[in-house]
Amino acid sequence: MQNIDLISEQEAKKLLKELADKIAMYNHAYYIEDNPLVSDSEYDQLFNINLKLENTFPHLVLSNSPSKKVGANITNKFAKVIHQAPMLSLSNAFDEDDLRDFLERIKNFLRINEFTPIFCEPKIDGVSFSAIYKNGLFITGATRGDGYVGEDITMNIKTIKNFPHKIDNAPEFLEVRGEIYIEKQDFLNLNKEQEAQNRGKFANPRNAAAGSIRQLDVAITAQRPLKYFIYSGGVTEQNLASTQEQLLTKLKALSFSVNEISKLASSEEEIFAFYEYLKTNRHNLPYEIDGVVYKLNNFAMQNRMGFIARSPRFAIAHKFPAIIGQTKLLSITVQVGRTGMLTPVAELDPIEIGGVVVSRATLHNFQDIARKDVRIKDYVFLQRAGDVIPQITGVDISKRSNDTVKFDTPVFCPSCNSKLRYVSEDIIIRCDNGLNCPAQNYERICHFVSKNAMDIEGLGRKQVAFLIDKRLISNPLDIFFLKEKNETNLIRLENMDGWGKKSVANLFKNIEKSQKISLQRFIYALGIRHIGEQNAKLLAREFGSYNNFIAQMELLSKNDSDIYQKLNDLEGIGDKILVDIVDFFYVKENTQLIKRLGSVLNIEDYQETREQNILTGKIVVFTGSLSTISRVEAKEIAEKLGAKVTASVSLNTDLVIAGVNGGSKLKKAKELNIKIIDEVEWLAFIKNA
């Protein structure tokens, strides 16, 4: 990137637009998909370039500038929760000079000469959340979202061990804010479980926590080892205490978990000493921290300082430097995932970083390799900040030799040699060859047999690779004819290396056992991109039986608009997922395989767990403002009674509940002659349901 100190106004205008688009994409990947595309340090670098350009050319600041936004726009998978006060992020200090500037700004703003006490806390590398209590009862939990509107994760938070559902001696209204995280050892154990179940491993504890708390299926969240710390009282904190130190004491007395590792610093020297102490000892903590948060201790002074667009003036995060190492890049391998996405991985001369021997590192994406000019046989800099595999941050050009080799971004799939499809400016590259691609086929079979899919015990990744190599299976269907094929083979499976009579007998028994399966698990086992367990359940619930499901999907592949609209109305099935479903069933091989699987499996119809009642299976839409209960509560009640609540009115809608100012949804319902009731009728309706 060119020297931004010498950049022209025209160049700055263009670069600000590029930065806004790129940072928005990175925010979406990090906050919404829990799948970061770049390292924290690279993100911070881009963000700081954006800030510097905006300071130099303030008249060029865009309306969608990342400096004005927190997090990312939320999805439609969860109900929305409007925060009582914005949940902003913190500005960053990367060195002592940045921190001294922060302390000087406090003095200048408050017009004081003396040092005012600063409260110092570890910066937990987790997921921010808010929790609301009324009369001591926990009623609403939400993610940060975009800072102003979060996602409703109330039921998910309730699964966290030791999180209080009821508080004694609490004020009438209470908000607390904190961080949800997973401890290091729990994270390692979780990834072992993921691997054993043929499921993807999480990149780091933060990603695992984010992916766990944002599950549509609360039962999955309940299985995850989530913990939390509370660090703020939100809009109510100044009713509880007059300082941050007093607040944490009060929150602890109310039975919340607070971080005991904190310090009230009375001088600049004490701040730096606390930072050095945590930086040195962070590896001994059971959880990941990535810096220290400093806040003015006095709430009255915090009020005087106020906020800027996306962060408070009275607080700052002092980031730790990542653990750095240097080693030789031996090669770059390209992995092809189950859905065809290609990922570059650096193969390294083994090196110890932070007590862990590292032989592989992530290169994030192919654009990243070109931007950093990473070449095979280069000496590369690594950083490790809690990731399972570290990140390559740059190249030691001074050690570059003449025999280094530039990496060519693949044009053809390394597994099947088919032409690749480039998505998002080379950041994402896909192979669209599906089952005909050996790598995708292998990953898809591994997913098919995994615990939450067909659940065939004794058939893990190693065994699948062996059976494919010996040409005993080539697709999921072959698994169910393996016993028959084995009986006619010259060399039987039980006589091959790594197998025995008992293990083979158990495998065949487990294969037979797996042939009776619920519709939702069967749909999940198919491995459709973005169709996880919850979305598989939504589809199973919508179509009811295997025969109806496959018939409707065949119509969808032929561009049937009614089926398309029906899927589009399902809460949780957005445009992106709908495109993935259409793409999957457009491939004839996929449909043929599913039909053949249907002939050998006993796929059970979807069974609703709740009792049947008047609302079961009905599609309901809420519009306008309700006065007696919130929209979120109304939605939960409707779903508990078996209804499907959707966001838009269509021909498939059975009932519209209209509050005050119903708007366009109410108008459309009248045009389509859909039954409409008001709030009073709705309350009477659910009472008798």
From Swiss-Prot:
Residue numbers binding Zn(2+): 413, 416, 431, 437
The top of its lineage is:
Bacteria, Pseudomonadati, Pseudomonadota, Alphaproteobacteria, Rickettsiales
Which keywords describe this protein according to UniProt?
DNA damage, DNA repair, DNA replication, Ligase, Magnesium, Manganese, Metal-binding, NAD, Zinc
Enumerate the active-site residues. 123 (n6-amp-lysine intermediate)
Catalytic activity reads: NAD(+) + (deoxyribonucleotide)n-3'-hydroxyl + 5'-phospho-(deoxyribonucleotide)m = (deoxyribonucleotide)n+m + AMP + beta-nicotinamide D-nucleotide
- What EC number(s) are associated with this protein in UniProt? 6.5.1.2
This entry carries the following GO cellular component terms, namely: cytosol
The free-text function statement in the UniProt record for this protein reads: DNA ligase that catalyzes the formation of phosphodiester linkages between 5'-phosphoryl and 3'-hydroxyl groups in double-stranded DNA using NAD as a coenzyme and as the energy source for the reaction. It is essential for DNA replication and repair of damaged DNA.
Give residue ranges for domain BRCT: 610-689
Task: Spell out the CDD domains in the cross-references.
Answer: BRCT_DNA_ligase_like, LIGANc
Q: What class of enzyme is it?
A: ligase
Positions binding NAD(+) in this chain are 40-44, 89-90, 121, 144, 179, 295, 319
Entry's Gene Ontology molecular function annotations? DNA ligase (NAD+) activity; metal ion binding
GO BP term, example = DNA replication
Q: What is this protein called?
A: DNA ligase
* Family to which the UniProt record says this protein belongs: Belongs to the NAD-dependent DNA ligase family. LigA subfamily.
- Organism name: Rickettsia prowazekii (strain Madrid E)
Task: Give the transmembrane region(s).
Answer: none
Cofactor (UniProt): Mg(2+); Mn(2+)
